[in-house]
Amino acid sequence: MLRNAFLIFLAVGSYGLLHSLTASHQAKQWVRQHLGEAAFRWYRLAYNVVFTLLLLPLLGLPAALPDRVLYVIHPPWVYVTTALQIAGLALAIDATLRTDLWAFLGLRPEKPAQEAHLVIRGAYRWVRHPMYSGSLLFIWLMPAMTLNTALFYAALTLYIIIGAYFEERKLLAEYGEAYRAYQQKVPMLIPRWPRKP
């Protein structure tokens, strides 16, 4: 188990570190300065393609290691968990559609920071990072869980929490007081129970 945990956390950590470093303002600035605007225009698309391809062997890692089943959720509870997974997917999809989807995919240039606006509609009214919240809800409610998948999801969860922390710093730098006020009103990942009027 310790060997599996080490390999899984190392793989996810390496992927996450590379993913975060290449998404940073510094990396983008380097590409812009050294490769020019024409190359930078396709940076986001290349980034998405490369990290999607790198994700495939990472997803296969838990299956490649010795494993054991922890639990399987049976009816009627599996209907509840599946409904919650669908809700998680809906949350993530809504969040994606509220942003500039084509720019997110890299098919249209991103707007400069000064032209971008803070999105606080839809799923963003409940949590500041609905894509992460929806993804976490989806993975942790899988109807079957093995030891390796639990370790993999734990590593992903840790990466998401750390990534959200650094993303918050970037958003504060971009949006200033508007984002600070948003932070005070809306939780990061777990929605608050609605308050009574």
Question: Where do the protein language model's features map onto the residues?
Answer:
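Juxtamembrane helix-capping/reentrant segments at transmembrane boundaries
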Residues: V31-V50, H74-W77, E110-Y124
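Short, Lys/Arg-enriched, Gly/Pro-containing loop segments at transmembrane-helix junctions
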Residues: Q29, Y71, L101-P109, L172-E177
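Hydrophobic transmembrane alpha-helices
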Residues: N4-L18, A113-P197
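A generic, lipid-embedded transmembrane alpha helix
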Residues: A46-P62
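Membrane-helix interface linkers and caps
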Residues: L21-A38, A63-V72, K170
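Helix-coil boundary and interhelical linker segments in multi-pass alpha-helical membrane proteins
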Residues: M1-I8, L59-T81, L141-L151
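Membrane-interface loop-to-helix entry segments
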Residues: Y47-V49, V78-A90, R121-S135
